[in-house]
């Protein structure tokens, strides 16, 4: 008698994706982040669902409904802070996942890669709209500043912004629609994740060496299910340490002040995971130029397969490219730091230099270094 897991129409799909999936025998802990992102998504959807049961998306009651969740709902504080800090863990895993893809040349699977970038945009949009919902000062002014960027679009900009706002400023209509979109987007993300996995399983996983590993595959279960559990435990440990010991570490104190359209906070800044893009946006004095730089700072990931000029896929055996890669990482840390600083000397010039360096490394230095390495290896 054949095994149900191999014959049942539904269970068969799960079996081929998570149990009998042929996996390279040498993938490192850097390949854990896919499953960790899946876990983050599940945590966010579940905590978000319970928060939505108590939250009201009205300008008069939104702030007090979040207060009510934290004070009066059973374990409401836990659910709220797990959701807020879960977003931070989500982005940490996302950045590491993308970084792994860049380092080991996973972008060669360009369908999987491009869907991954669409996923990144979708998660960023969801996080932005979620940040508006508590209706604190930074929620309100963050929404005002970021949506206002669309007014830089020639001809239709102003109309577009008012259409998104549902009025002449960020108000009740804006909050209600942001809540609706914030609720629906995670399910769209889940559908995209399925497509992401579908494309990945067409080709199989990459591995640290960047070489074809068809001759040496092992089943996903039990080897990588056990290996992933370590990552899961570390993720939950980090998240719960953050939630239980310093839940407001990554938040902004201004968001504990209810939204007031008449009082602008001294420093408007987004959550930490958007600071690198915010620094790039601010480094260009022109509004439209800044918006374009902001979009291209993420979209540039899509052209990585075209910029790959090396004869080797992975950076594992390319020390020069490794150096450039880690300079890029340091540059992103610099941009993140600058994004949280006020717009004054010397932060302005540091931000501008870091922004220019970001684009130069990706568009010029990495491809050039790849060519040099090819020459050194007489390829």
From Swiss-Prot:
SUPFAM superfamilies: a domain/subunit of cytochrome bc1 complex (Ubiquinol-cytochrome c reductase), Transmembrane di-heme cytochromes. Binds 2 heme b groups non-covalently. InterPro entries: Cyt_b/b6_C (IPR005798), Cyt_b/b6_C_sf (IPR036150), Cyt_b/b6_N (IPR005797), Cytb/b6-like_sf (IPR027387), Cytochrome_b (IPR030689), Cytochrome_b_C_euk/bac (IPR048260), Cytochrome_b_N_euk/bac (IPR048259), Di-haem_cyt_TM (IPR016174). Keywords: Electron transport, Heme, Iron, Membrane, Metal-binding, Mitochondrion, Mitochondrion inner membrane, Respiratory chain, Transmembrane, Transmembrane helix, Transport, Ubiquinone. The chain crosses the membrane at residues 33-53, 77-98, 113-133, 178-198, 226-246, 288-308, 320-340, 347-367. It comes from the Eukaryota. A ubiquinone binds at residue 201. GO terms for molecular function: metal ion binding; ubiquinol-cytochrome-c reductase activity. It is found in: Mitochondrion inner membrane. GO terms for biological process: mitochondrial electron transport, ubiquinol to cytochrome c. The cytochrome bc1 complex contains 11 subunits: 3 respiratory subunits (MT-CYB, CYC1 and UQCRFS1), 2 core proteins (UQCRC1 and UQCRC2) and 6 low-molecular weight proteins (UQCRH/QCR6, UQCRB/QCR7, UQCRQ/QCR8, UQCR10/QCR9, UQCR11/QCR10 and a cleavage product of UQCRFS1). This cytochrome bc1 complex then forms a dimer. This is Cytochrome b. It comes from Spermophilus xanthoprymnus (Asia Minor ground squirrel).
